[in-house]
A protein has these predicted regions:
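Gram-negative outer-membrane beta-barrel transporters
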Residues: 1-91
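Extracytoplasmic loops and strand-loop junctions of Gram-negative outer membrane beta-barrel proteins
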Residues: 8, 43-49, 101-109, 156-160
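Short, local alpha-helical segments
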Residues: 98-108, 117-124
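Outer-membrane beta-barrel proteins
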Residues: 2, 14, 49-53, 65, ...
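Residues that define the transmembrane beta-barrel architecture of outer-membrane proteins
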Residues: 6-8, 57-61, 115-119, 133, ...
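Hydrophobic, well-ordered secondary-structure elements that form the walls
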Residues: 12, 26, 65, 77, ...
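Intrinsic-disorder/low-complexity loop/linker signature
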Residues: 18, 45, 100-101, 132
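C-terminal beta-signal and adjacent terminal beta-strands/loops
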Residues: 80-99, 125-180
């Protein structure tokens, strides 16, 4: 834990809509989160301290746009932006066997991550089967740009806490819904 912290910033959220036809909701946060003094986060005394609070990006935001261009068809676009941040990456404390198929870091390090933009699209079409039953088909793509952490640890000696950014790679989905 740090000896004290300064956290400040600004958050902006907004929504605009035109009936059922279209709506846009957006939010953005710009913040600064720093310890007042160097904080030593590793048990390894040779690892430098930091004033940056781990896992707290200075910038992040989101948007959701939905539209229904016709009575039976609607779609949504959404996205989440996560700015760069500092994330601790701990080296294994156990001795790594020489025949291990994986490479591991040898010293704890504070990693300055890349930023990520997770973009999604979903399409829906509703068929009216009769006055009491409707069938909706939907499909889309989550994380279209495949924004994903590329340096995940692997194997038995991995740092299981070392992850950041979107947790799901590009994913295609389809669905069906029956309702009244």
């Amino acid at each position: 834990n740090g000896s004290g912290a300064e956290v400040y910033g600004i958050n902006i959220d907004g929504k605009i809509a035109h009936g059922r036809d279209a709506s846009l909701q957006v939010g953005f946060t710009a913040q600064r989160s720093r310890y007042k003094e160097l904080t030593y986060w590793s048990e390894d005394s040779s690892v430098e301290g930091t004033r940056n609070m781990p896992r707290t990006p200075d910038y992040y935001g989101y948007f959701t746009f939905t539209a229904a261009p016709s009575k039976n068809f609607d779609f949504s676009l959404s996205g989440v932006y996560t700015g760069r941040m500092h994330v601790p990456h701990f080296a294994p404390t156990d001795e790594i066997p020489s025949d291990s198929p994986y490479q591991y870091i040898v010293k704890d390090e504070m990693v300055h991550t890349p930023d990520f933009f997770d973009f999604n699209v979903k399409l829906n079409y509703t068929f009216v089967l009769n006055e009491h039953v409707k069938l909706q088909l939907n499909g889309g793509v989550q994380n279209i740009f495949n924004a994903f952490q590329e340096d995940l640890d692997r194997g038995v000696f991995r740092d299981s806490g070392y992850f950041y950014g979107p947790t799901q790679p590009r994913t295609y989905f389809i669905g069906i819904k029956l309702f009244n």
